[in-house]
C-alpha cells in the first residue's frame, strides 16, 4: 500500500477501508480503552486524528510510547469523524513507531516564541509557524515560474560566484581560496588575487541582471530567480544578507509594459497563495498579522498608482515635511521619500 499524505486524506471525497499514513505525533490524550493522537506530516497545517484502541496487540508495548514528537506509521480505516471541527479520522488497525521521542521533546501544543524556536533550529520546521511559512514559500516559488513561463519567458541560470557587480546593488561578499593568514603578496605589498582560484577577485552575486540583459538581447523575454547576497551590515526588516530575487528582462518593452507586468505578477501571486494556501494564510492572520488578509485584498482590488518622477518630486516638495535628505528635481529618492509616497498619500 502506498502512503497517503495527510492533506489528501483530509480532502478525501469518501471513506476508505485501507489507508497508510506516516508522520509525527503532535498531541495525544488517553481515555480508558483507547488513545487519540493528532498526526501531522507537514503536508498541511491541520493534522488528522488517529484512534488507537487498547485491543491492538502492541498497545501497551508500543502505542503507549508514542509521545509527542514520535515518528509513527499507521494503517487503518478512514472514517467520518464523530468530533467537531474535522471531517475524517483514522481508526488504526496497525501501529508502528518509526522513531521515538521522550518527555524532553521541546515542541509542545502551546505557542512558542521565535527566540525559543531559534534555540531548537533542528526542530523548528515542525512548528506551525515554520511549516506554514515554507509551504507558502514553496507555493509562491512555483507560482513565480508558472506566471512567467505562461508568458513565454525563458528561465536562465546566472552565476552565483562572479567577478561582476551591478549598479547600486550594495557591497559584495568576497569569495577566495587564499590562505588568509598568509596570503600571497604582490611586489607592491597588496594581496595577489592572480594566485586565487579564478585568477582574479570574485564575489557572491548581488544580481543576475547583467547576464539576464545579455540573454534578453538574444532570447527576448528571460528571467532569473535565485539566491542573491548583499554585504550590507544594516540590521533592519528591509535588509537581508541573503535572499531570493526575481529579475525579468524584456526585449522590445517600454516602461508602461514593464509596470503592467509587475502589477499583474504581484496580483497573480496573491491570488495563487489565497487559493492554494488558505489555511496557512489564515494562521498568519490569526497569530502573526491580523491585518494580513485585508492588506492582500486591498492590493488585489486596487489598481497600482502610476506616478512620474517629476510628479513625485512635486508631491514631496509640497508636503511641508522636513526631510533628512533634501528634495529637489534631479536628486535620488530615499527610503523616507518612498515611504511617504506609498504610505501617506
Roles of regions detected by a PLM:
Residues 2-251:
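Class II aminoacyl-tRNA synthetase-like tRNA-binding/catalytic domains
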Residues 32-33, 212, 256-257, 320-322:
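Short amphipathic alpha-helical segments with coiled-coil-like heptad repeat character
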Residues 132-136, 254-261, 304:
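Catalytic cores of large soluble enzymes that bind and process phosphate-bearing ligands
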Residues 165-192, 264-345:
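Metal-assisted phosphate- and nucleotidyl-transfer catalytic regions
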Residues 217-219, 254-275:
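His/Asp/Glu-rich mid-to-C-terminal helical/loop segments that flank catalytic regions of hydrolases
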Residues 234-235, 253, 300-303:
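Alpha-helix capping and helix-loop boundary segments enriched in small/acidic/polar residues
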Amino acid at each position: 500500500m502506498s502512503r497517503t499524505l495527510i492533506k489528501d486524506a483530509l480532502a478525501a471525497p469518501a471513506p476508505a477501508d485501507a489507508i497508510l499514513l506516516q508522520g509525527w505525533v503532535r498531541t495525544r490524550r488517553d481515555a480508558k480503552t483507547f488513545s487519540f493522537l493528532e498526526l501531522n506530516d507537514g503536508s498541511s497545517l491541520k493534522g488528522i486524528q488517529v484512534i488507537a484502541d487498547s485491543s491492538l496487540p502492541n498497545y501497551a508495548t508500543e502505542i503507549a510510547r508514542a509521545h509527542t514528537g514520535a515518528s509513527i506509521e499507521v494503517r487503518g480505516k478512514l472514517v467520518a469523524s464523530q468530533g467537531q471541527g474535522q471531517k475524517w479520522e483514522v481508526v488504526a488497525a496497525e501501529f508502528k513507531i518509526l522513531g521515538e521521542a521522550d518527555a524532553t521533546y521541546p515542541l509542545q501544543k502551546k505557542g512558542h516564541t521565535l527566540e525559543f524556536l531559534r534555540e531548537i533550529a533542528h526542530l523548528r520546521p515542525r512548528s506551525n509557524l515554520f511549516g506554514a511559512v515554507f509551504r507558502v514559500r514553496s507555493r509562491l516559488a512555483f507560482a513565480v515560474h508558472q506566471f512567467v513561463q505562461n508568458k513565454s519567458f525563458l528561465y536562465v541560470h546566472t552565476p552565483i560566484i562572479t567577478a561582476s557587480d551591478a549598479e547600486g546593488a550594495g557591497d559584495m561578499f568576497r569569495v577566495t581560496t587564499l590562505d588568509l593568514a598568509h596570503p600571497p603578496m604582490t611586489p607592491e605589498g597588496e594581496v595577489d588575487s592572480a594566485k586565487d582560484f579564478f585568477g582574479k577577485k570574485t564575489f557572491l552575486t548581488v544580481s543576475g541582471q547583467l547576464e539576464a540583459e545579455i540573454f534578453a538581447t538574444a532570447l527576448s523575454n528571460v528571467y532569473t530567480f535565485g539566491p542573491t547576497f548583499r554585504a550590507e551590515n544594516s540590521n533592519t526588516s528591509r535588509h537581508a544578507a541573503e535572499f531570493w530575487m526575481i529579475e525579468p528582462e524584456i526585449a522590445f518593452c517600454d516602461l508602461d509594459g514593464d509596470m503592467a507586468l509587475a502589477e499583474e505578477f504581484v496580483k497573480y501571486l496573491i491570488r495563487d497563495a489565497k487559493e492554494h494556501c488558505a489555511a496557512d494564510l489564515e494562521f498568519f492572520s490569526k497569530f502573526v498579522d491580523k491585518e494580513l488578509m485585508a492588506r492582500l485584498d486591498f492590493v488585489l482590488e486596487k489598481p497600482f498608482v502610476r506616478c512620474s518622477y517629476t510628479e513625485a518630486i512635486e508631491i514631496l516638495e509640497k508636503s511641508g515635511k522636513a526631510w533628512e535628505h533634501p528634495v529637489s528635481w534631479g536628486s535620488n529618492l530615499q527610503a523616507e521619500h518612498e515611504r511617504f509616497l506609498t504610505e501617506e498619500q
